[in-house]
Amino acid sequence: MTTTDVFPDALILKYEDVTVEDVEQIVYDAMFPRGPEGAKHTKIFINGRDLKTVNDVLERAAKCMFPPFELAIIVDPRGAYTTASAAVAKTLQFSIIKGFGTLEGKTIAILAGTGPVGQTAARLYASEKASVIITSRDLQKAVSLATRINEELKDERVQGVKAQTAEETGKATEQAEIVLSAGAAGTQILSLNLLKNYAKKCRVVADINAIPPLGVEGLEADANGKEILPRAFGIGALAIGKLKNQVEIELIKKATIEPKGIFDHKIAYAIAKKTVLEKTKEERKATAETPKHWLP
């Protein structure tokens, strides 16, 4: 949909139920008929629900390419990469704006964090040198994911914990300065009572769920840095979604400009981070330039 909005004249061919075994033929059919020059203007967008399958498809597609036949590949499985990038960037933005600093050294709790958005956010937070707690009702699932991310990053920054009960969820947030609710749509993960009684160190809380009941009680979907508890500032799903849409557009545009390359969560986050840091800088400059007699 976004690609059509950005490039209404583009020819888009859709392949459904693609398996890893299908990839080679699809890539070759895209590369060869138009020659090396035409290949530069042919892009592949990998969607999908299961991140393992998405990564397997990406790996196979990349192996099919060789000079001068190389295509740009965009990867955003059901919007998970751009959503996670926007969520992490927004929490960074308000951590800085509210005077709590960058993500480095922070403890982050990602509630219901084993889904596509949660695990992508965990990778991004860990890459920013934060300590990450991933919760799941299934302890083994959380631990397995944490181990996999640590192995990828060659660092011990992520841990998985069980959070099947309200008390377990609350305890998972006790040390967190930032909390991200990454659960399924229409599911409340964190009550205001848990946030108040357990997450006493929390300064920024974000929610990716825009369908009532929302993931965090008391955090409205359109909240954009609203103080929901003393010194705890909330970011709702619509505020995250607005940045997500901007990131997706820029990701697609970037891939169309470049003749080759992989445009994944790392590139998406770089775009999101740059966007919020530039906005933060502009807001600080505007505040500094405001005459003192205008201030309350």
Model-identified regions with their sequence ranges:
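N-terminal ligand-binding/catalytic initiation module
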Residues: 1-69, 268-289, 293-296
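Flexible, charged surface loops at secondary-structure boundaries
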Residues: 32-41, 67, 126, 171-175, ...
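Glycine/charged-rich beta-loop-alpha catalytic/anionic-binding loops adjacent to active sites
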Residues: 66-74, 104, 229-231
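A glycine-rich, Thr/Ser-enriched phosphate-binding loop motif common to dinucleotide/cofactor-binding enzymes
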Residues: 75-93
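Short glycine/serine/threonine-rich phosphate/pyrophosphate-binding segments
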Residues: 84, 115-121, 142-143, 187-190, ...
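Glycine-rich phosphate/diphosphate-binding loop of Rossmann-like nucleotide-binding domains
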Residues: 94-178
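Rossmann-like adenosine-cofactor binding region
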Residues: 156-234
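Adenosine-phosphate binding glycine-rich loop
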Residues: 211-296
